[in-house]
Amino acid sequence: MPRRGPVAKRDVLPDPIYNSKLVTRLINKIMIDGKKSKAQKILYTAFDIIRERTGKDPMEVFEQALKNVMPVLEVRARRVGGANYQVPVEVRPDRRVSLGLRWLVQYARLRNEKTMEERLANEIMDAANNTGAAVKKREDTHKMAEANRAFAHYRW
């Protein structure tokens, strides 16, 4: 915790094409080594692929995918009398979005398609259909929380 009071939350500007702060945050998650224009090109091409394959608005597909990936519960380690317990806690709204975006990009990178654009597009489409690795990650997180429900009274 900082000694000088709470840290001010930085706000991102909405992206120029879709006018969405979520899209800007996703671009920032995709970005490696500060190459933002490359990250933008990857995302916009992925959105074009989504539009082409589904015939729907890519923003709607992306928002549905994000909704399906965002976790409601997670476990946090809590030390009680020399033992570490995995205590299930609710995820804060801003952290839910951050985790959802992070998992989408992380599991898109692990896919086997040739280009990052294809990987990202397919991961977003899979997530929108409630399949894919990012959705599995959310399910695993929820399963962990459910398995450790007995320790819920240690919440802080």
Swiss-Prot record:
GO molecular function: rRNA binding; structural constituent of ribosome; tRNA binding
Keyword list, A-Z: Ribonucleoprotein, Ribosomal protein, RNA-binding, rRNA-binding, tRNA-binding
Alphabetized CDD domains for the sequence: uS7_Bacteria (cd14869)
InterPro entries noted in UniProt: Ribosomal_uS7 (IPR000235), Ribosomal_uS7_bac/org-type (IPR005717), Ribosomal_uS7_CS (IPR020606), Ribosomal_uS7_dom (IPR023798), Ribosomal_uS7_dom_sf (IPR036823)
Cellular component terms (Gene Ontology): small ribosomal subunit
Keyword Cell membrane annotated: no
Transmembrane annotation, as ranges: none
Record-linked Pfam families: Ribosomal_S7
Signal peptide as annotated in the record: none
Gene3D superfamilies given in the database record: Ribosomal protein S7 domain
Top-rank lineage group of the source organism: Bacteria
Example GO biological process: translation
Subunit description: Part of the 30S ribosomal subunit. Contacts proteins S9 and S11.
Family recorded in the similarity comment: Belongs to the universal ribosomal protein uS7 family.
Matching NCBIfam families: rpsG_bact
HAMAP family, A to Z: Ribosomal_uS7_B (MF_00480_B)
Physiological role: One of the primary rRNA binding proteins, it binds directly to 16S rRNA where it nucleates assembly of the head domain of the 30S subunit. Is located at the subunit interface close to the decoding center, probably blocks exit of the E-site tRNA.
Name recorded for this polypeptide: Small ribosomal subunit protein uS7
Organism: Geobacillus kaustophilus (strain HTA426)
